[in-house]
Structures are given as structure tokens and as C-alpha cells.
Amino acid sequence: LDLGKQLMPIGMLVVLDSILNRITQNRAKGRNTFIFIDEIYLLFQHEYSANFLFTLWKRVRKYGAYATGITQNVDDLLQSHTARTMLANSEFIIMLNQASTDRLELAKLLNISDLQMSYITNVEAGHGLIKVGSSLVPFANKFPKNTKLYKLMTTKPNEKF
């Protein structure tokens, strides 16, 4: 759906408000809410949605919700001061192979050592670095391609069921 530049902020407001309403409804029912925002950097291109998301990010856990932001190019995300603050204060971050400029920015923001940087530099799919609190842990998440689990988890369309 292409709303164009004029209607995009209004469209985002409607969607974000709907998410907040669902979180509130689920809390009243004793349910957790899991929010996955793909290409999250797009929300930081508009001041209102960036501020709304910043507030939501800080409050959702109190409402039994868990927010996950996803982006392939961290550099796009880090253009926003609000996004940088959110990323720096996030307790859990998964980093896969990163482009050179993205690695440098992440290293500065998250205090990643040169050795730790090697885990997100020219690595195979499924390898990377996890930030949990103040700890950084390397990981290798390899599954045989001929398994159902692999077919469920792969992001490659030609390898899905």
C-alpha cells in the first residue's frame, strides 16, 4: 500500500495507535503481545512515529508486551538520534554479518572490541553476536538444510516449504 508522502505519517499514526490498543486489550486479558517491526528505520524518518515508537519501546514491557525491531542496514537506523538511544539502551540485540560502516557505528555505540567485531565481519549466514545486557556473546546457528526446522526458519523464499 503506497500512501504517498502526505498520508504516510497519518497512516503510521493509525497503525501505531492500533498496536497500542491491542497491547492494552491483551494486557486486560492477561495475554502477552509480541510486536515485530520489519525495516524499523522507516518509522524514524518521521518525527511523530519516531517519538511514538520511542515511548512505546520504553513502556511495552510494563504492559506484558515485547517489541522487536528488524533492519538489514543499521546505518539507516543510526541516522536518527532517537533510534541510536533506543538501540544503546536495548537489553537484547542480535547482530549478523554487518557492512563495514555499520560495524564501525555499532562498535562505537555498543563498545564492541576488535575480537568481537570478527564475529560480525564476513561471516556465514546464521553466525553473529548477541548483546544481552552488558555481555556480548558470539553464536553460530547452523541447521541442516534438509530438516523441517530449517525450512521453517530460513528467510530464503526458494528454500521454504
Where are these regions (language model features)?
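Conserved P-loop NTPase motor cores
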Residues: 2-120, 145
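Conserved P-loop NTPase
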Residues: 110-161
